Amino acid sequence: MSEISLTFPDGAVKVFPEGTTPLPVAESISKSLAKKSVSAKLHGAYVGMHDMIPASGDFQLITTSDDEAISLLRHAASHLLAQALKRIPKFANMHFGVGPFIDNGFYYDTDNGAGNQVSVEDFPEIEAMMHKIVKEDLPIVSREITREEALSMFAEDPYKIALISDLPEDEKITIAVQGDHIELDKGGLVPSTGWIKHFKLTSVAGAYWRGKSSNPMMQRIYGVAEWKQADVDAEIQRREEAKERDHRTIGRDMDLFFTSQEVGSGLPVWLPNGATIRRQVERYIIDKELANGYQHVYTPVLSNLNLYKTSGHWDHYREDMFPPMDMGEGEFLELRPMNCPSHIMVFNHKPRSYRELPIRIAELGMMHRYEKSGALTGLSRVREMTLNDGHTFVEPEKLEEEFKSILTMMMGVYRDFNITDYRFRLSYRDPENTEKYFDDDDMWEKSQAQLKRAMDDLKLDYYEAEGEAAFYGPKLDVQTKTALGSEETMSTIQLDFLLPERFNLTYIGADGQDNHRPVMLHRGIVGTMERFTAYLIEMYKGAFPTWLSPLQVQIIPVNLGAHGDYANDIQAQLQAAGLRAHVETKDAKMGYLIREAQTNKIPYTLVLGDSEVDGQTVTVRKYGEEKTRTMRFADFQSEILADVANYSRPVND
């Protein structure tokens, strides 16, 4: 009998009969391992627990303890959902798009035609059918089929036919079979439906097929799947909290911004309250950059297309750019997708000396990205954005010093915005796949070592990620945890050795020769104003610190006739001091007006009655506090100004 030889991660080699599946392999090691084994890998490709191991090679068992195992469970849960829908008569003729796992869950895109759309009211029936299939404990088996077989098998589902038709002619096509249900699948599932015990359907939303608005609108059914019910419950609770923090909901409730089809998808309109928050962020960041030696500029939002051909954006980034505008006579203008070529023009508009370096150029630069309709979300994914952008041109030997300077400024900004949950990622090129990166081995080795040394000098913890570098140089990414639990890149410092070559940037060195090449550092401290404001809205849950709050002081006279003049005088003094204050003139009960101020999350509410007018005092109620304080107005003004000046942190922080 023929045999196969399997090499395990610890280097051990075992021989098994040809035709063996991963399950007896796991059992040969231990029964407990077999019970925990979710799937297997041969040379990095998934092999189901009931599938034949096709050849000898490097072999690994995936258990419930492995991080990737939860993704396999969630992927299988999407298949379970589809199988359950097909068993319910009113959904029996449903068509299916794609059903992947995602962070914290899964979804499946479905199309049931004009009638019998899925609603949340259907979820109990669908979940009951899913649990029934779980009890059947159907083995999940993969097998390879021909293209002709696949087209015949899925002939009634136009979406599956489209997926099959898009595959290269020589692509292997595999299916996953569980009882009466068949899925197009490349592998990576649990052994049987009995493993998918703990799940919950959460929502249904519209989604264009393949994210294009010209394609049919499908229904995307979302769900959660975990190994334990307690984890499902925790995820549902987290999502309820997420709804309360969703910047789109808070933005609507607090009149911060809106989006509309009349204006255009992905083009948010900033209302006065939201514009005030954004303006405070912009003023803050400009002042911070000016204090750190940056020169602020304004550059056009439109540029000659040739600029982006020289930079390489047109070749590598064209799908994310809007079509060029033909101005006639061979001139084409392009909405810029990035600011760096414009800042290179600022550097290059006159000869530069080493004595001027580093030259730090910054801008709140408006950019445009051709985002698909299906990807657009509130402020966080838009088509027009303003980036807190900066570029430094530095001598190669001063690179490390400049990197540390940028990072120190960045951490100061995080402190002022009370951003504490983040980690640093040093992103290097992939040493096993160097051909996709800028071709200079010496540069890569030196620059990666410089970034690592700078982080060590600053005594900052970081992790290293090979293969995450940009093609033109290594970078530092700051990964922040959002209030909704996801991780995003907020800030970045990227080394660029390529664009200075493409644009032939030089400076005059100490030797008097104008042939020295600077290194370019791209850096973004808070990213785009849109995404950063969305982050702040969700982090603060709309209860902004005083310095950022759209309205800082709500003044409520007990009687507008008797106390209105004093209220207006207080407002005038606060506004003269640079504060944002408003006198409430509505005719309503005092309790209602105070509650409304608290609902609107205004940091300070002042109540003015006879005693306050007579004593030139104010009665102060701070947001989130039940107690009130009566104090001299001058003392209150000093307190709130100190609050603003200290970015609303405790004075001794």
Swiss-Prot record:
Which UniProt keywords are present, listed alphabetically? Aminoacyl-tRNA synthetase, ATP-binding, Cytoplasm, Ligase, Metal-binding, Nucleotide-binding, Protein biosynthesis, RNA-binding, tRNA-binding, Zinc
Q: Quote the cofactor binding remark.
A: Binds 1 zinc ion per subunit.
Q: Which cofactor does it need?
A: Zn(2+)
Taxonomically, the superkingdom here is: Bacteria
- Does the keyword Metal-binding belong to this entry? yes
- A cellular component term (GO) from this record? cytoplasm
Return the InterPro entries for the record: aa-tRNA-synt_IIb (IPR002314), aa-tRNA-synth_II (IPR006195), aa-tRNA-synth_II/BPL/LPL (IPR045864), Anticodon-bd (IPR004154), Anticodon-bd_dom_sf (IPR036621), Beta-grasp_dom_sf (IPR012675), TGS (IPR004095), TGS-like (IPR012676)
A Pfam family in this protein? tRNA_SAD
* Predominant subcellular localization, coarse grouping: cytoplasm
Give EC number(s), comma-separated: 6.1.1.3
Q: Its catalytic activity?
A: tRNA(Thr) + L-threonine + ATP = L-threonyl-tRNA(Thr) + AMP + diphosphate + H(+)
Residues that, per the record, bind Zn(2+): C340, H391, H522
Q: Where in the cell is it found?
A: Cytoplasm
Q: Does the keyword Ribonucleoprotein apply?
A: no
One record GO biological process? threonyl-tRNA aminoacylation
Region (Catalytic): which ranges?
246-545
**A Gene Ontology molecular function term of the record:** catalytic activity, acting on a protein
Where does the TGS domain lie?
Answer: 1-63
On subunit structure and binding partners, the annotation says: Homodimer.
Q: What does the UniProt function comment say about this protein?
A: Catalyzes the attachment of threonine to tRNA(Thr) in a two-step reaction: L-threonine is first activated by ATP to form Thr-AMP and then transferred to the acceptor end of tRNA(Thr). Also edits incorrectly charged L-seryl-tRNA(Thr).
* Family, similarity comment: Belongs to the class-II aminoacyl-tRNA synthetase family.
Question: What is the protein name stated in its UniProt record?
Answer: Threonine--tRNA ligase
Tell me what organism the protein belongs to: Leuconostoc citreum (strain KM20)
